[in-house]
Every structure is written in structure tokens, then in C-alpha cells.
């Protein structure tokens, strides 16, 4: 079968022929229909410092997907061949304190598909049946293909009550863009998104952001004054940029709450005085709550949330290089690759 493989320990990704995997007793073989390129996949493609520490060359990458059940393991019940599914990309142990306590998204033994084990950029893949999520007929496959990052955005946006609140989102990548849309969809007052990429800021505006701010050209404080704001009630940090995070701390209202998804560089500092004396709450966000986030994000789409607005490119798998080039250049929202 075809698969996108990180064959060599340098920049690039390779379309190769690899064996079709065989499902174990509790696994399902999935025939992929569509997959989406994630920021993590771009890191692996670029072979940055994180990738060099984490990725084993020879790995089939990818973790955002939709497909159909092709074969059931001998012990699998509750699914049928032909059903359309996506899946939670974090495989958890099931026996640690957090798994047994109803917090599997915090499992310290998590294995990530397309990072630690072979992933979804292939014609077929195997997944534990317990990780599957059935996709309703009303949701098109090109949207279901990126439910994974949509879930990250939903986890962040729903972590704190944003109804009637002023929300600051630092980072207009696809997750930040989607989070902006969710916050407006559920009733935030003002949603302000910052970045330095005008293309992606426009996508955030199209998704419903009240104001988008290119911080290389415009002061966030000036925007706050224009909106008659004393400070932001909720912050969603998506950029992983220390300067953006410190700007957020500076602009938060006393008692504000921050959900952090962006991964900061090692040793990055922040103004702890602002966290302490403003009484801020800072909550780290990892993955999606299993499976409450999946339920809520599915219902959001079914209720009219315009997830399609972040989808900018659909390409056949043979044009995968164009997709990675668009992502590297910052000229895309979500890029979906078709395996049909």
C-alpha cells in the first residue's frame, strides 16, 4: 500500500510502498479516505529539534484522518465493516491512576499515532477499537478528517466559561482559528486574535473573530482601548511564543483564566508577578477529553458551527508535497489529502 514515510533523518517526507498492517484481536483495520496535515506533521517534515529527539526514521506519520472500517479484530464487537470513523490519536494504557479515574487524556503512558507508532498517512491503518469515533452521515469526510485538531480547539475554548466574556487568542494557526469560531458560536462578547500572518488572521476574521491584530503592525493595547476593555477575561494561548504569552499576561483582567495549548521553548520565561498579583488561573491543555470533547465538537458541527471555513485546500495524495509547501509557507488553513 502507499504511505507517507519519514524515511531519512533530514528534511522531507517520502511516498513509499509498505505492507498492509494486520489488526490484533482488539484492533480495527481502517481504509483511509482523507487525512489532514497537522503542525506536528510539519515539524516532522522539517526535521526540527523536537522531531530529532522524538521520531524514529521509517515511521509512517499522520494522525488526522477519516476512513471506513475494513476488518475487525477477533475480539472486537460493536462495529461493522463499512462504518465511517475517525479516532482518538492518543492510545492510553487503561490501567494508570488517571485512566481508571476517568481522566485518560492525562495518561502518562500515552502513545501517539504517527509519532510513536505508525500513523494515518497511508491507504490502511490499524487502531484500537476503543479509540474509534463514528462519524454521522451529515458531516462530510473533508471535515471529519481534521477532528483531531478541532478537538484541541474545542478542549481549549470550552475549558472556561466564555459566555459574555472578552477572549484573547494568541496564535492564528488552524487551532486558534477554530477556537475563535467556537468562542463566538457559544456566546463570547469580544474575541480578539493575534498573529503576524495576515492570511491566517483573515481566516480568523472569517470564522467570526471580533478583531484580528497583526502585532507586528498594531498594538494590542490600542485595540483594547478601541473596544472599551479593561482586560481580557479568558486567554487561549496557541502560539508557543513567549512574547505572545507575556503580552497576554499584560492584557488579562484581574482574576482572568488562561488555557495554554502552545508549546513554549525550553527555558522560556514569563512575568510571574502578573500571574500572582492578578490572581490568574493558568491551565495546561493536552489533547482532547476522552470522549466528552469528541461528543461536544460533533454536536457543534451538527448545530451549524462553520468548521468548513478553516479548510482551504484539498489535494490528491500524489500532490502531498504541495500541501507541505503551503503549510511551511503559512499560506493555508487546513490542508486535506485524499487517498481515494
Swiss-Prot record:
Binds 2 Zn(2+) ions per subunit. GO terms for molecular function: L-threonine 3-dehydrogenase activity; zinc ion binding. It is an enzyme of class 1 (oxidoreductase). One of its GO terms (biological process) is L-threonine catabolic process to glycine. GO terms for cellular component: cytoplasm. It catalyses: L-threonine + NAD(+) = (2S)-2-amino-3-oxobutanoate + NADH + H(+). Zn(2+) 1 binds at residues 38, 63-64. Its cofactor is Zn(2+). The record marks 148 as: Important for catalytic activity for the proton relay mechanism but does not participate directly in the coordination of zinc atom. It comes from the Bacteria. NAD(+) binds at residues 175, 195, 200, 261-263, 285-286. InterPro entries: ADH-like_C, ADH-like_N, ADH_Zn_CS, GroES-like_sf, L-Threonine_3-DHase, NAD(P)-bd_dom_sf, PKS_ER, Zn_alcohol_dh. The keyword DNA-binding does not apply. Zn(2+) 2 binds at residues 93, 96, 99, 107. It is found in: Cytoplasm. Its EC number is 1.1.1.103. Belongs to the zinc-containing alcohol dehydrogenase family. Homotetramer. NCBIfam families: PRK05396.1 (NF003808), tdh (TIGR00692). This is L-threonine 3-dehydrogenase.
Amino acid at each position: 500500500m502507499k504511505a507517507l514515510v519519514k524515511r531519512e533523518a533530514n528534511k522531507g517526507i517520502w511516498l513509499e510502498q509498505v505492507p498492509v498492517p494486520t489488526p490484533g484481536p482488539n484492533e480495527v483495520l481502517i481504509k483511509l479516505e482523507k487525512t489532514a496535515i497537522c503542525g506536528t506533521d510539519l515539524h516532522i517534515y522539517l526535521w526540527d529539534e523536537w522531531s530529532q529527539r522524538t521520531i524514529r526514521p521509517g515511521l509512517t506519520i499522520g494522525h488526522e484522518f477519516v476512513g471506513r472500517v475494513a476488518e475487525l479484530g477477533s475480539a472486537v464487537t460493536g462495529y461493522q465493516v463499512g462504518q465511517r470513523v475517525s479516532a482518538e490519536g492518543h492510545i492510553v494504557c487503561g490501567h494508570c491512576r488517571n485512566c481508571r479515574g476517568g481522566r485518560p487524556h492525562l495518561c502518562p503512558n500515552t502513545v501517539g499515532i504517527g509519532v510513536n507508532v505508525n500513523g494515518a498517512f497511508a491507504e490502511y491503518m490499524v487502531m484500537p477499537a476503543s479509540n474509534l469515533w463514528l462519524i454521522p452521515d451529515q458531516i462530510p469526510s473533508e471535515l471529519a478528517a481534521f477532528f483531531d485538531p478541532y478537538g484541541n480547539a474545542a478542549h481549549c475554548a470550552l475549558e472556561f466559561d466564555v459566555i459574555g466574556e472578552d477572549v484573547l487568542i494568541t496564535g492564528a494557526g488552524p487551532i486558534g482559528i477554530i477556537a475563535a469560531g467556537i468562542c463566538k458560536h457559544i456566546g463570547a462578547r469580544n474575541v480578539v486574535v493575534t498573529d503576524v500572518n495576515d492570511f491566517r488572521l483573515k481566516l480568523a476574521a472569517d470564522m467570526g473573530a471580533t478583531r484580528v491584530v497583526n502585532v507586528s503592525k498594531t498594538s494590542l493595547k490600542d485595540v483594547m482601548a478601541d473596544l472599551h476593555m479593561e482586560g481580557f477575561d479568558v486567554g487561549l494561548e496557541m502560539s508557543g511564543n513567549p512574547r505572545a504569552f507575556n503580552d497576554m499576561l499584560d492584557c488579562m483582567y484581574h482574576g482572568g483564566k488562561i488555557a495554554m495549548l502552545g508549546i513554549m521553548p525550553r527555558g522560556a520565561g514569563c512575568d510571574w508577578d502578573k500571574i500572582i498579583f492578578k490572581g490568574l488561573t493558568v491551565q495546561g491543555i493536552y489533547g482532547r477529553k476522552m470522549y466528552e470533547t469528541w461528543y461536544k465538537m460533533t454536536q457543534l458541527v451538527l448545530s451549524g458551527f462553520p468548521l468548513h471555513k478553516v479548510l482551504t485546500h484539498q489535494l490528491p495524495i500524489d500532490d502531498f508535497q504541495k500541501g507541505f509547501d503551503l503549510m511551511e509557507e503559512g499560506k493555508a488553513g487546513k490542508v486535506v489529502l485524499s487517498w481515494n
